[in-house]
Amino acid sequence: FVYGIFTKSQDPMFVEIQGISEYDFVILDSEHGPYSVSQQQNNIRAALLRGLLPIVRVSELSENMIGKALDIGALGVQVPQIENAKQAKKAVKYARFYPYGERGVCRFVSAADYSAKDRNEYFKSSKDLLVILQLEGVQAISNLDEILDVEGIDIIFIGPYDLSQSLGVPGDIKNPKVLNAMINIVEKAKEKNIVVGTFTDDYEMVTKWKNMGVQYISYSTDSGMFYDYSRDVYNALRMCGEKEKKSLVLDSTLSNGGQVIDWKYSDKDIKFILDKLENSKIEFIEMGILNDTI
C-alpha cells in the first residue's frame, strides 16, 4: 500500500512537509489547483528532494499538458475523466516514447537532465513513468472492460465524488450505488493485475478499501488537512482557561424530580442545546453563580 495527498498549494514548503512526514507520493493538482508550469516544476523539485514520488494530475486529456508535466520532471501523470478505450489509449500514447507511445521529444528539459542524460536511457525511461487513469462516471463504468484491456495503464484511480454525481447522488460517496460501482471497478481491475487507487478523507473508508485490495490511497488534501488542524487548534484555544465543567439542571417537571447533566462544551454550544429542549424550565449553574436563568 502507498499513501499520498493531493496538493493544492503553490508553495513547495507543503510538498516538503509531506516528504518529511514520510508519505510515498504527492499528487500535484492541476485540475483543481491554481498552478502555473513553473510553480509545478518547483513543487516537483521539492518532492524529489524529500523522497516523494511526484505525480501531476493534468486538467484534461491533452497531449501538450501530459508532455509538459513529464518534461518538468513528474514521474507520473494522472488523467481525469477517462470514459472509453480510445481516450485511455491516447493517455498512454501521450505519456510514453516509441515504441510505447508518441510523446513529444525534447532533451533539453529537467526530465532529460537538460541533455546530460544518455539519449537512449532517456527514451527507455518513459516506460517506467506511471500512467494513472481516473474513472469517475457512468460512461467509464459502461466501457470498463475495454478500458482495462488497454496496454500501458499502471493504475486505475476511482474518483468517488464525480462518480456520485454521475450516478445521481452528488456528494453521497457512501451511497450503495457509488460503493457497488467502485467495488465492481476494483474487482475487474484486480483480475487484469492493474493497481487500483482512490481518494478518501475518512479513516473508516481507508480500512474498507485496503481490505478490498485498493493499494494507491490518496488521503485528503494539503488545504483540507490544514483546515482540519487549524479548526481543532482554534477550538482548543477557546476552551483554554474556561471552567472544565458546566451543569444544567432540569426542572422537577422531569420524572426523576430533577437531573444534573455534566457538560464540557462552550456557552454557545449549551445555548444551542437549551433552545432544543422545549417545555422545560432550565437553570444554569456555574461555580459561584447560582440560578442564573438563561
What are these regions (language model features)?
Residues G76-Q87, I156-Q165, V214-V233:
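Glycine-rich phosphate-binding active-site loops on the catalytic face of alpha/beta enzymes
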Residues F14-Q41, P160-P176, E283-I294:
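Glycine-rich, proline-tolerant flexible connector loops at the mouths of alpha/beta enzymes
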Residues V37-D71, K93-G101, F123-S126, K174-G197, ...:
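Alpha-helix-loop-beta-strand connector modules within alpha/beta enzyme cores
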Residues F1-I5, A116-K127, I183-N184, K190-E191, ...:
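N-terminal amphipathic alpha-helix/helix-capping segment at the start of soluble metabolic enzymes
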Residues N64, G101, L237-I294:
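Catalytic cores and adjacent flexible loops of soluble metabolic enzymes
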Residues N64, A74-E151, Q165:
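Conserved anion-binding
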Residues F1-P12, P54-S59, L129-S142, V195-T200, ...:
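Active-site mouth loops of central-metabolism enzymes
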Residues I5, D29, V77, A91, ...:
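Conserved, mostly hydrophobic/aromatic
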